């Protein structure tokens, strides 16, 4: 027998009251985006659960994708059979013979949403349990905590059987907590910060600063590949490439070396905030971890934050590097993050950066530059690409855009 569908149960949605259907619809769309790499799979959702109809797709591959989607508590692969007692008996026997191992206990759990069916739930449990004893004479029934709990559901259109429950990712459906702009450098920390924001339902857009010719096409692709890894948790993500060469050259020419990193980060924060405003974001998210590098001391954070009133979320701020690496390996971003491409935060990094920069000093050095003009030109030059779980589709779309 082949699985016909996957029954998906929701996570924290039960607490959302009147907004429940908005959350469910968002989760359905996220599941559809993530499973778009399996064209034959169709997804539906109602108030109680969602269903992914396999239509011949490989269950194992689809299940691996579903495990990553935030907002799912658990799911079960399901067999669909004709709504007939004899067909059900045969199906139950086949399933049990396939999964039973010596010494296992079992239980039949039946329920009917179609109350016109010829047997009620108790009678169905007895009838199907008897069929199991016929097929496996030595099997033992056990009502509490059996090894196999074979669930049977009678609906109007058919009967459905399942015995396995797979744990989901939990969290909230991506997009139900508003939008945030993720400052994505290409290192280890920022993708992990993005992942943790996604888990709490934040719809992220990835803002990446590129400084060609100092940064290479490889560095840009690395950031896009990291973004693609994050799409498996909630669907498509907008990738925003910001031209940053002019600003970095201006900072290098007009500011002392000790303040290069502080001023660079202040410009990045201004630009990200401007993009956030245009694209209706609510917060800025970054991968800063307290004390990890010179720009991540409390004094540096204060000096950099001074250019915006927008809330800055730092999901990894209290984590040790090894804790961050553990998550990066778990979500499969680590190997990409350590690829040897320099990003714009490292190309002009000073040997001895200021660890306790003063806001008044930063403002004094910025007064030598046309700050507003530099920011406006950078924002005007952004390029936006929608990153999907399907790399080939993105590449074809980019090719078409280039031709046009």
UniProtKB/Swiss-Prot annotation:
Cited InterPro entries: Rossmann-like_a/b/a_fold, ThiI_AANH, ThiI_fer, ThiI_N, THUMP_dom, THUMP_ThiI, tRNA_STrfase, tRNA_sulfurtransferase_ThiI
UniProt keyword ATP-binding present: yes
Classification via Pfam families: ThiI, ThiI_fer, THUMP
A Gene Ontology cellular-component term: cytosol
Record-listed E.C. numbers: 2.8.1.4
Keywords, alphabetical: ATP-binding, Cytoplasm, Nucleotide-binding, RNA-binding, Thiamine biosynthesis, Transferase, tRNA-binding
Domain of life: Bacteria
Binding site for ATP: 183-184, 208-209, 265, 287, 296
Location(s), subcellular: Cytoplasm
Cited NCBIfam families: tRNA uracil 4-sulfurtransferase ThiI
Family, as annotated: Belongs to the ThiI family.
Known role: Catalyzes the ATP-dependent transfer of a sulfur to tRNA to produce 4-thiouridine in position 8 of tRNAs, which functions as a near-UV photosensor. Also catalyzes the transfer of sulfur to the sulfur carrier protein ThiS, forming ThiS-thiocarboxylate. This is a step in the synthesis of thiazole, in the thiamine biosynthesis pathway. The sulfur is donated as persulfide by IscS.
HAMAP family to which the protein is assigned, alphabetical: ThiI
Protein name (record): Probable tRNA sulfurtransferase
Organism in which the protein naturally occurs: Streptococcus pneumoniae (strain ATCC 700669 / Spain 23F-1)
Gene expressing this chain: thiI
